[in-house]
Each structure stands twice: as structure tokens, then as C-alpha cells.
Amino acid sequence: MSVSPSSPAPTENPPAATEDLAWRKHIPALAAAVAGIREASDAWDAVSDSFCDTDGWPVDEQGYEDAKVKRDAEAWRHVEVFLDHGPEVLAGVRATARSADYAEGPLSEDLRWLRGIDATLEHAGQLQREWDQILALMDASMPGSRQLYEGRTKEERNADGWHYADELAIRGPALVRAAEHLVRRADAEQSAHTTRARAALARSASGLRGTMPASPPAPSAPGAPVPGRSR
């Protein structure tokens, strides 16, 4: 299977010690973010039709817009979690996965789904940086204007970010599954290594006990007759 140009080429990595997988601590946050984006999307799907006629045109435009604003805001909150935790987990997965994982096995499909997630995270991060710059310009050039315009600019950012939230709802689960699989495998390999090491140590200790030299005979008691000598 070919690898995306944006993805580093897989290498044959030795079994990773579990203590080296520092990125594992970020996995629960990503799993929660995936669930959060899905919940925001499902909540929108549940009410969006109620604001529209049978042809799909809004009949309650204000209600439709308010519900969409709420969806975008909730989804973006979880996109920010991906921006904080996703790059480190993605790098860890790619550093830990082996060449064989890309070709076949339980990881292969999830690794394929990770193609393009770099671009999604980069574009979402750029959107966040642009919004931060806008706020900084407001504070610098129009003191006091932030309170007037921040809410509206935030809504615009969230609306633009919905596309990236939707992408992460598709590719994010693959990242979480791949990360969890690699961590479990590393734990299992580390446990097996520890078991083998203990068994080898036990065999070594047993062998040393079996070859210990015999103790020298105890000296004869004083006055005892010497064997082989006549009186």
C-alpha cells in the first residue's frame, strides 16, 4: 500500500517500551472530542428538519440559524481539543506503527483513514491563528471594540470550522482506534518481554544452585583414630 506524501514512510520499529509512549495520555481527550462532535451533529440533525418545509427550505430562519450557531460552537470546542492533542498522538502512531501494519492486519484500514488528517489539523489551526490575530488587532487598533465584535467574529470562525469538525468526525475515530491498538500491543509485548526475562533469570538461578561445589568434609574430632593406621 502506498503511503500519503504528507505521511512519513513507515519503518520497521522495534517493540516500543510502554514508558516511551508518552502520547498515550492524550488518547482519552481525542476520544471524548470525537464523541462530542458526533453529539453536536446528531443534535443538529434531530432539529434541522423542523425548521424547514418539505422541500428543505427554512420556514423558521431565526430558529434555523440559532440552532446552526449552537452546533458550530459546540463542534469547534472539540476541534480545539484535536488541535491541542491530535498532532502528538498522530506523530506517535506513525512512529510506532510498522511497515506490516500498513499492508494488512487490524491497523491497515485505520492507517489509510489517517491520510489527509494532517491537512485538516493544519487548516483548522490556521483558522484559529487568524481569529487570534483578529482579536489582537481589535485590542490594538480599536480599544473596547472587542466586546462589540468578538461574538460575531467567533460565530464566523465556528461556521468556517464546521467543515474541519466534520472531517475530524470521520478521520478522528481511526486515529483513536489506531492509537489504542498500538498502546495495547506495546503493553502486551512489554509484558511478554518481562515474563521471558523473569523466566530466564529463574533458570539461571536454578542452574547456579545445581552446580555449587560440595562442602568439604568436616575435620575429624581430636583423638579420633586415623583410618588405616594400626594401633
PLM-predicted stretches and their roles:
Residues 111-205:
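Amphipathic alpha-helical coiled-coil/helical-stalk segments
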Residues 1-81:
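Leu/Val/Ala/Ile-rich N-terminal alpha-helices, chiefly Sec-type signal peptides and the beginnings
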Residues 46-153:
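Long, low-complexity or tandemly repetitive, helically biased scaffold regions used
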Residues 194-231:
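Long low-complexity, Ser/Thr/Pro- and charged-rich intrinsically disordered regions
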